[in-house]
Amino acid sequence: IGTNRKGSTMDLGMDMWKYFGITHTDHTVMNPLSLEKTQELVGLLRLPEGGRVLDVACGKAEFLCLAAEAYRVMATGIELSPYTIEAARKNVETRGLADRIELLHMDGGEYKPKAPESLDLASCIGASWVFQNHRGTLAALTKMTRPGGLVLAGEPFWMTDPDPEYLKFTGDDPN
């Protein structure tokens, strides 16, 4: 049984992070955006060269790799899953970006930048549970971002009603 950040349980029959690692094995981007939309988003950011970027719940660090390649930023990625952080490290190393992207295996809600209000971009895409909810995410990221910097928060949403059995399995069943 795994427990999500909301305290709900999922009877996975295995470690929760291993389960998510398996279900996301073939995903380059592990959030509610496709690779193409992620590339488009990075192109819209207009980050300063050498800027400071943070991505909380960075998954396989694809967003950070794209930002580092496009803008030569210095980036930090935070990921709680021991399986996903290893995939992120491989992605960063394979692309020759280890000198610009630092990856931390930790709870993103516990992260504190070296200086408050110092980041050019603070992002958390598809994982607002890290900071309890969407408002908590915006508040936490804003405190880390310099005046005039960018805060990027994304939420997954259902385009159609999910199967009740899925909601029951994930512990998100409102009943």
Which role does the model predict for each range below?
Residues R5-P48, G50-A57, E62:
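Conserved class I S-adenosyl-L-methionine
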Residues E62-E110:
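Class I SAM-dependent methyltransferase SAM/SAH-binding core
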Residues P113-A122:
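A short acidic, Gly/Pro-enriched loop at the edge of an enzyme's catalytic core
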Residues C124-S128:
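Residues lining the SAM
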Residues P156-P174:
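Short, glycine-/aromatic-enriched active-site segment of Class I SAM-dependent methyltransferases
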